Each structure stands twice: as C-alpha cells, then as structure tokens.
Amino acid sequence: MKAYKDMTREELFAEKEKLEAMYQDYKGQNLALNMSRGKPSASQLDLSKGMMDVLRSDSNLTCEDGTDCRNYGVLDGIPEAKRLLGGMIGAKPEQVIVYGNSSLNVMYDSVARCMYEGVLGGKPWALQGKVKFLCPVPGYDRHFGITEHFGVEMINVPMTPDGPDMDMVEKLVSEDPLVKGIWCVPKYTNPQGYVYSDETVRRFANLKPAAEDFRIFWDNAYCIHHLYNGEPAQILNILEECEKAGNPDMVYEFVSTSKVVFPGSGMAALASSTANVASIKKQMAVQTIGHDKVNQLRHVRFFGDNEGMEAHMKKHADLIRPKFEALISIMEEDLGGLDIAEWTNPKGGYFIGFDSMPGCAKEIVAKMKEAGVILTGAGATFPYHVDPQDRNIRLAPTFPTIDELKLASRVFTVCVRLVSAEKLLAEKA
C-alpha cells in the first residue's frame, strides 16, 4: 500500500471508511485487554515459585557472617545479598545498601533525603530555591512523578539511540547550580529500549556540575533483562567511570529484582561511593534497624550466585521474546510503508517506543480504550504528562498472553491507521 501522504483525498477517504468498519467490529467484541504497564505475565511469575520452597520451618536461617536473619539488625543488608545485587551491576559489596522490595521507594527516599537533609552534609535542596532536574524524554513516568511531587522543576532533554543529548546535558549542568540531578535508565531505556553508548557513559562520569551537590540518578532497572541470549548489550560501569574521572560521589545507582522474581516481593539496592554510602547509612539508622533479611536469604539460596540469576533470566527471555517479536511483526505488516509511524526494536527491557504522526497519540490511546484495550496514557512518558508533539506511546507487551497480545496489536494498528487517515483528511480539507 502507498504511503498515506501520497494518497488522493478520495483514496484516503475510502481507506478511512474501511478502517472505521474494522474498528467498529473490534468494538463489538467487548474486549478487555491491557498493555498499560510493564508487568511480568503469570507464566513469568511461575518461574520463581521455587523461591517459596527454599526456606522452611526447619531451614538454617543464619547468614554467612553468623547473623540470625530472623532477628533485628544489619542495616545495609546481609553480605551475600549485597554481593548478589552488586554483581548485577558490577558494584563492590561495600558500595551497596540493600533495602526492601522497591527500587522506586529507594529513589523516592533518595530525592527526599537530598531535599530535606542535603547531600554529604550540604545545604538541603529545598532551601536553595527552585531546584531543577534533567529528564531525558521520552522516559519513565514514575521518575517524573517523584520529582513533580517534590516541586522540582523538570527540564526535557531529548533522547537519542546512544542516550540523552549530552551536549545539552553538559551545558545545563555546567551553567546552572540549581540543576541538581538527572534521571537515567541506561540499559534498555524505558520506553525505547536504547542502550547508552560508552561515550555517553564517559561523558556522564566527566560532567563538571556547577552544583557541588549534583547527582546522577542511574536507575539500572533492566541491567540483566535481555531478550536475546546471544550477545547481550553491555554498558560501562558508571561507578568505575565516575571514580576514574575524579567524581566518585556523583552517582546514585539503583537496582532491584522486581522483574527477576515476584514484583513486590523482591530486593532493591542503592550503590554509590563509600562516602555516599556512609552518609546515607547514618541517616538510615534513624529510619530503620534493617530490612527483610529472611527475603534476602531466600534470594541467595534460590539463585546461589549471579550465574544462577542469569540462567533464570534466560527463561524470562524465552517467554517474552515471542511477544516482542509478534507485536513488532504485526506493526511492520500493518503499518510498514505507510509513513505514519515509527517504533523501536529493542533487544531487552520491557517496552517498545512508538511514535505516531504528531498530534495523534492521545486520540489513538482514546480509541484503543473505547475498543477495550488499555494502553499507557499518552503523555505519560514526559514530565507533567505533556508530550509537546503528542506522538509518543509506550507499548508494554509482556503481561497479556500471546493470543491476547496479537489481537491487541491488530486493534492498535487499526487505531493508528484510522486516526492518521482522519488527521490527513482534515489537513486536505
């Protein structure tokens, strides 16, 4: 089929009429499908059911340093859990603090700590005026929700296949002392699935911030979440690169097992310089005596080591890879050559980034909802839920069954084509 922009008004009208009939047919099926969040499917959750059996009433609940995991204590996590989580991102155990089940919780606490208690004994951000955060876009809506909650001004930074626009990052960070941080998902970015290049990581490590208390919030959420088991993507170790550059304290790195085992029942951690870790632990000691050591021990006993975790992740990949491939194949089949959309083809992570024609995303998402298919809200991938071009949509293929996904994908391509045809017809009026 020819590109929509090359069609005559009559051809475009005929196409719209055909698509409207297809759309009404889908609406009549009373669908109830959901592609809105990056949730593991039930089959993926089944992979970790064995975790429920590794600790029993007669199990030895003592960790390697002799601590009884049933009792109070161990503020920063048992040694073997620090080693396991650190191994996911190449951090040394002494750089790691193990928290509870949620890395989002850790990120929220980290921003709150900077706002109200300051960084390494410095003046709290909240007392310095209207502080700012750089936000690579499109990006993760829950990151933006945290900084919006604290009244931080968010500045859009365009994303490229190699990472954020580093010329813009370097300029803003070096010129404005009120720029205090940046959100990053460096590996298999949310939503596009990009991987930061070596040059990008090095440029981050070598930033020269005007603010002494500037921090990179490095959310390595998908560090081992590969779709293909051949040559997985690799990124430079930001902790090591910052140390080489003489900026060891500049990064907070976050990691969790939420999409490795059971979301809500995993482990989360922060990794940073020994100075940052010492400062955070001093503040944490007022907040808690320690997190769930039994769960930490359960993880270690289940996986054994990082090789065991990597073998487990290959099972996840085998389940979700066909879903990514099915969605991309259907988009290529139904939208290829029409010149009305672009999408990414990630090699890991949980999302596919989709760009419609400008001005169409909200209407596409609304039509999908009318047809019984829920997507992430248009604009969610931008601060304040405002996509300046109204074109980005985050697609999350992991949760539905493969048959549900294929059906939802067909509904999606019909909605994209219908909204695009209507827009072009209006422009040709």
Write out the residue ranges for each language-model feature.
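Conserved PLP-binding active-site segment of the aspartate aminotransferase-like
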Residues: 353-358, 375-410, 414-415
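N-terminal "arm"/small-domain region of PLP-dependent enzymes with the aminotransferase-like
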Residues: 2-76, 86-87, 370-373
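Glycine-centered flexible beta-alpha turn that most often forms the glycine-rich phosphate-binding loop
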Residues: 219
